[in-house]
Amino acid sequence: MKTKGLKVLTAAAVLSLGLMTMEALAAEGWAMSGNTWVYMDQYGNRVTNEWRKGADNLWRYLNGNGEMAVSCWADEDYFVDSNGIMVANKWVKTRSYYGGDEDVWFYFGNSGKVVKDGWKKIDGRNYLFDSEGVMQTGWTEDNLYYLGSDGAMKTGWRYLEPPYDEDEDDYTYGPESDDGQYWYYFAPSGKKYCTSTGDEEGEYRVSRIDGKYYCFDSTGKMQTGWVYMDG
């Protein structure tokens, strides 16, 4: 009788354990904890520092406390919106993941990862991003390209202030200008017309644009009046 009772007890214990395991497995998924969402694994523990999909099949990130991250950087190279959804194919203005005092523009690609280190064509326009993913503006790439305040690479004629010359610690002004701005011409590739980008050797470059000839100096400023040229 004792042996029979032990068998019954063991069977009951196994059944109870099985039910507990089934309940734990069924509990895996999203749950509310106070005012925030968490994700519980099959053992009833919060998932931390990992991505999980919601019922809408969109990715969300669980931070170090196991809470769903919102409106912040996630996993270093990604960003989640106010609903916790991973941003993709979208511009975001925020502070850098690495710190900073001002909000700046970033672009997150199709995979959700921030674009870094180079040029990226977005909606038909070219943009340049640094090693942190910050969208660049102004003169760049050895002052051969110009990016507007919107970050887009400019082409054609542009009336601009000259690039800042760090070696001279001053602006590289050429011929006198009343407002400190000069005409520059940028090819369809975005590259500035100047002596270093032309076929000529010397202080000036002469180029035909829309049927007319123009002269540019070594910095790319369009010249007016008399210009002394060797040869």
Located regions from the model:
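Extracellular adhesion/carbohydrate-binding repeat motifs centered on closely spaced tryptophans
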Residues: K2-G231
